[in-house]
């Protein structure tokens, strides 16, 4: 495939790959250092402080506050001013410390915001700064759309896709990768070109057609003609009656053309009907009134020149209505935005992305499902076992939330056994996989869950805990996980831990 943007070949680690994308697209970053994501903000700030500009020629800002809670709160405030992509980078306890701000970030529908995460275990009986999925799982309940890469290549590409999805869906995105195993692992990578990012994302201060009816109602339901008529109504006492009628008649007769006249080409035809002292205002009204059904790519939720309050108190009559609207009209639209962004990015780069990646699954009888860097290891082991005649496969989840039920069920339909690899003892991925499969079984007796393939029975399920705090995972441990599905098929196992009787 001759892709338009095949990428710039380099050797880079995950933190560097993400930071480079941020440097190209962000208008600002507010972050606080915490291992293993510290380098993301450091590399970004080194680029910015050296005079670096994003692909739209804007010199971005960076601010380091006194802690992770303030970093997320500040990033939220910056993102609400609109017109720019904004990020924070964090991990582990830093995410938990700022968790209340993460809930607010999602609840306010702050489009264009992306949280960059180098996933790290949350310290429990002892401190550990290595890989684990506890922090990412902690974000699930806040409502972020969550993408998860397996290597620096995917970390960079999914970073670009994250900004697109966040801006179009208005639901903030977490772009996650494994701490150290990806964030610090040097790898051959095809970095996204600046021209690709400019074309793929679009100017965050530019205008787009509202992609859903809910967004149009929120941002663009009235439009230019309505606003111009409102202006005339406020100043009608200043008009000659004949001129007032002529101005109103012109707007009525040319409503469609006026609505689309973003450059103000028609305004000159109307100036003769306006008192001289109003002509400058009228021209500004015309140019600053936006076309009906459009919005800024990254909307402004506050005006820094006219600040106001967002998120006032809502009690019994209203709060549930806001939550219902959030899920029904915004969150439910996210999967389609993700699929469209991944398809467009794949077309531009030749690097294929889908919510669920499958490897040798078509005729597989036993399959492992995982998140992050372990799936690359599992694919290598799978290839080896195939040479031994084993019908095995690997499913790598790229979209963790909203969980891609339909794609997951399609990938696992007809399999004898499935092992879910969990880099956390919370087992949230196991829960998501199991729920998706149960929906497929329910659909066998009639479509109760639209879009999800019907399956007659469930595969034997195993949860395999591995790599907590970067506990060593050897190829032989993954071989054992596949063999478990062929033999005793224990429902819960640890990989790499030895038990003594």
What are the residue ranges of the model-derived segments?
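Thiamine diphosphate
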Residues: 1-137, 143, 160, 179-180, ...
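Conformationally flexible catalytic loops at phosphate/diphosphate-handling active centers
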Residues: 60, 173-357
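A general structural motif
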Residues: 125-129, 337-353, 370-378, 397-404
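Conserved thiamine diphosphate
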Residues: 127-179, 191, 200-226, 457-468
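Peripheral docking tails and interdomain loops at the edges
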Residues: 421-501
């Amino acid at each position: 495939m001759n892709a338009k943007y095949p990428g710039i070949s380099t050797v880079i680690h995950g933190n560097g790959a993400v930071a480079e994308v941020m440097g190209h697209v962000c208008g600002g970053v507010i972050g606080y250092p915490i291992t293993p994501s510290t380098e993301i903000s450091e590399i970004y700030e080194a680029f910015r402080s050296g005079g670096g500009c994003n692909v739209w020629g804007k010199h971005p800002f960076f601010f380091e506050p006194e802690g992770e809670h303030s970093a997320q709160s500040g990033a939220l405030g910056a993102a609400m001013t609109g017109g720019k992509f904004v990020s924070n980078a964090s991990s582990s306890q830093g995410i938990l410390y700022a968790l209340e701000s993460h809930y607010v970030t999602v609840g306010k529908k702050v489009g264009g915001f992306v949280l960059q995460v180098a996933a790290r275990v949350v310290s429990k009986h002892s401190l550990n700064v290595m890989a684990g999925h506890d922090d990412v799982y902690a974000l699930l309940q806040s409502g972020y759309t969550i993408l998860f890469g397996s290597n620096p290549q995917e970390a960079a590409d999914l970073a670009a896709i994250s900004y697109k999805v966040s801006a179009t869906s208005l639901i903030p995105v977490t772009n996650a990768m494994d701490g150290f195993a990806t964030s610090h692992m040097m790898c051959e990578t095809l970095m996204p070109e600046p021209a690709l990012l400019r074309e793929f994302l679009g100017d965050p201060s530019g205008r787009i057609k509202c992609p859903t009816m809910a967004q149009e109602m929120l941002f663009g339901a009235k439009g230019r003609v309505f606003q111009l008529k409102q202006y005339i109504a406020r100043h009608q006492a200043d008009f000659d009656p004949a001129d007032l009628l002529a101005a109103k008649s012109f707007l009525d007769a040319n409503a469609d053309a006026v609505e689309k006249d973003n450059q103000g080409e028609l305004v000159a035809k109307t100036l003769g009907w306006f008192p001289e002292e109003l002509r400058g205002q009228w021209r500004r009204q015309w140019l600053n009134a936006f076309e009906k059904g459009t919005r800024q790519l990254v909307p402004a939720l506050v005006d820094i020149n006219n600040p106001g309050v967002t998120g006032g108190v809502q009690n019994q009559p209203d709060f549930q209505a806001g939550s219902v609207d959030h899920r029904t009209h915004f969150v439910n639209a996210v999967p389609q935005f993700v699929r469209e962004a991944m398809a467009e990015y794949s077309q531009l780069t030749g690097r294929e992305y889908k919510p669920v990646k499958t490897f040798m699954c078509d005729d597989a009888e036993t399959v492992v499902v995982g998140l992050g860097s372990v799936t690359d290891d599992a694919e290598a082991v799978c290839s080896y076992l195939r040479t031994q005649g084993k019908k095995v496969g690997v499913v790598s989840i790229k979209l963790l939330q909203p969980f891609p039920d339909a794609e997951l069920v399609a990938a696992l339909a007809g399999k004898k056994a499935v092992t879910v690899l969990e880099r956390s003892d919370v087992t949230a991925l196991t829960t998501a996989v199991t729920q998706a499969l149960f929906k497929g079984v329910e659909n066998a007796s009639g479509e109760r869950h639209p879009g999800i393939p019907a399956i007659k029975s469930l595969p034997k399920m195993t949860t395999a805990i591995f790599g907590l705090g970067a506990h060593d995972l050897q190829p032989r441990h993954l071989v054992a996980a596949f063999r478990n599905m062929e033999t005793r098929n224990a429902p819960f196992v640890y990989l790499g831990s030895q038990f003594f009787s």
